[in-house]
Amino acid sequence: THEKLGIGFQSLFPVLSVVDPELMRSVPPRLTAYQGLDTFFHLAEGYLSKKANYFNEMFSITGIEKIGAYLARAVIEGNDLEARENVAFANTLGGFVMSTGKLLSQHSLEHILSAYHPNLPHGAGLILISRAYFGFFIDKGLCRQKFIDMARALGNKNASEPQDFLSALDKLLEDCGVSNLTMSEFGIKAEELPAMAKEVIESLAPA
């Protein structure tokens, strides 16, 4: 159907969750990068959202700091338990951010990509569109201070311009070995894009 819709309902929340980084040691490097960057984009979208609040902004920035400091380590050395633990913690914070606020349209756009191409990993799809997506906001002069905040959280303590966020994102992608992904390697064709854009507007934007 070329649709990939998100759902949310109170009954989907577990009574108890056990997040055990020991179980994550064997996750392959590429999948670790994809899933860790999905976490990062949950945190970033939640931080930029109009629904952000003091409560989940705290979770967002803390989670982004953890991703900036530990994700590449977890990708490079899967048995680095300290790195696994901190990435898992960031992922948990991302869940708190989503459940107390709202994400932006980056996820909606990616859902269409992977609806058309089910073999496209969700995290990879987010990576493919991330620079253009956040660059659009920066070019429009939106959320200037928040982009600077996120650049600093990623490790650039001297960040002073929103563009520094894109540089920090580029470094994170490079450090995780996923900076050179292309749409064509996942079978995405330019002629599909108009239909995908229409699908986003019709099936996802109203939600």
Region spans (language model):
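A glycine/threonine-rich phosphate-anchoring loop and its flanking beta-alpha core
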Residues: 1-52, 145
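Short runs of predominantly hydrophobic/aromatic residues within well-ordered alpha helices
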Residues: 33-36, 84, 126, 193
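A generic structural signal for well-ordered alpha-helical segments enriched in polar/charged residues
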Residues: 42, 69, 73, 171-174, ...
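Active-site segments that bind and position negatively charged phosphate/pyrophosphate groups
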Residues: 46-163, 167-168
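C-terminal charged capping/lid subdomain of soluble metabolic enzymes
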Residues: 151-207
